[in-house]
Amino acid sequence: MRALLYTLLLCLFCSHTLLAQDQKPKLVTWQDIAALPAPAAGMRVAYGTDSLQFGELRLPEGDGPFPVVVVVHGGCWLSQYNLQYMAHLSAALTAAGYATWNLEFRRVGDAGGGWPGTFLDVAQGTDHLKAMAKQYPLNLKQVVVLGHSAGGHLALWLAARKNLPRQSALYVRKPLKVKGVVSLAGIADLESYATAEGSCNAAVPKLMGGMPAQVPDRYAHASPMRLQPLKVRQYLVQGALDPIVPTEQATAYARSAKSKGDAAEVVLLPNAGHFDLVAPQSPAWPLVLKSVREVLRQK
């Protein structure tokens, strides 16, 4: 009898373990996004003379003028990753009523990429909306910058660059004003990320031309954490199961931002990883879309 009871308890434990394993969320991967049918292409618009200085503009149906989401792709700032994986997100945002400007730019491995070219490209691409608004129905009083991973870093930086000193290599006069930022698994603290281990972490000194101790002034001008307060609404959407960008990147940044008077909110998704945030078919998508709407709702 005792042996039978032991056997039943063992079976119950094994069944519970298997059920728990079955209930683990299936995270979206890079391959999942790459396998999706390509959405209709946006209008390709050049913002500079280099072949990589362009963006894809998508406009909703109707007359406009439309609120604009500047989309900045990730990929560890490296040349082998381009804007294409953000096309599905851009198309979904456009279907929801937003004009999207999906930026391409020179990256590490491209001629002119890295410091300072990568930063100057995304700045130039964003500011080019001023010229584009003369031709397309864009509402430049309603601009949100949204970026993923390394693009989340650049999105936050785009909203922060107004705080740069004039002597900075990244300084641009009268940058386009943005209403806020939605950072999806964004790398908000460049210095702490550079000194941690990981393949994407190792790309930071390649982007910056050295480690924080070697080129401290560059990090001071490139890390959103060092350029606070941004004085715009910020949503940091983060998957708790992200193996590439730790949750602390979002939470530490938000704590620091709030201490300086900024409105910064972490949206933590317990069952999401790194790529769930940019997949419109994922359960994370409604919260991403809500974050964009909340930024634009602010007066």
What are these model-predicted stretches?
Residues L230, L236-Q238, D242:
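Short beta-strand/loop motif that positions the catalytic acidic residue
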Residues Y81-L89, L103-Q142:
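Catalytic nucleophile-loop/oxyanion-hole region of alpha/beta-hydrolase
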Residues T29-A40, D50, A160, S192-R226:
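Mobile cap/lid helix-loop segments that gate and shape the active-site cleft of serine hydrolases
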Residues D127-T195:
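Primarily recognizes the serine-hydrolase "nucleophile elbow" in alpha/beta-hydrolase
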Residues D22-D63:
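N-terminal cap/lid segment of alpha/beta-hydrolase-fold proteins
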Residues P65-G74:
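Short beta-strand element of the alpha/beta-hydrolase
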Residues P243-Q249:
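Conserved alpha/beta-hydrolase "acid-adjacent" motif
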